[in-house]
Design a protein with these regions (language model features):
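A broad, structure-centric signal for solvent-exposed, well-ordered loop/edge residues
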Residues: 20, 24-25, 35-36, 65-70, ...
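Generic hydrophobic-segment detector
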Residues: 16-21, 60, 67, 110
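HotDog/MaoC-like acyl-thioester-processing domains
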Residues: 2-13, 68-69, 80-122
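Hot-dog-fold acyl-thioester-processing enzymes
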Residues: 2-54, 114-122
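A contiguous binding-surface segment within folded domains or other stable secondary-structure elements
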Residues: 40-96
């Protein structure tokens, strides 16, 4: 893989929390957050190696605070480390309160990706 700076793998995504994405308490579903984290991190990994990647593992996924219907999830990711066969991507999620504009850190995770060729091999 070519050596590039973490800033070149940076991805910023935003998602509006809708009722279909929430539980009975009006909080976003953890599975929805995990899905968005995986997408955001995968884009960083793709930008880094310019090749197909697969998620190998998710480490240290921490849900720090709930996010509510109508709030904005703000996801940021970049490659933290790249080895010979895999790379670690860090993802941070902040939630912007739709009424006040106040941001709070709501989740973080580290994901490991592996680059694969057109035959699905590493």
């Amino acid at each position: 893989m070519n050596s590039i700076s973490p800033s070149q793998s940076y991805v910023h995504m935003q998602e509006l929390i809708l009722p279909n994405d929430s539980n009975i308490l009006g909080n976003v579903l953890g599975g929805k957050v995990m899905h968005l984290m995986d997408l955001c991190a995968a884009m960083s990994a793709l930008k880094h190696c310019r090749n197909q990647v697969v998620t190998a593992s998710v480490d240290n996924l921490d849900f720090l605070a709930p996010s509510k219907i109508g709030d904005f999830l703000i996801l940021k990711s970049s490659v933290n480390f790249c080895g010979n066969t895999s790379m670690e991507v860090g993802v941070r999620i902040d939630t912007e309160d739709r009424k006040t504009g106040i941001l709070k850190h709501t989740a973080s995770a580290y994901l490991t990706f592996v680059a694969i060729d057109e035959n699905g091999k590493t």
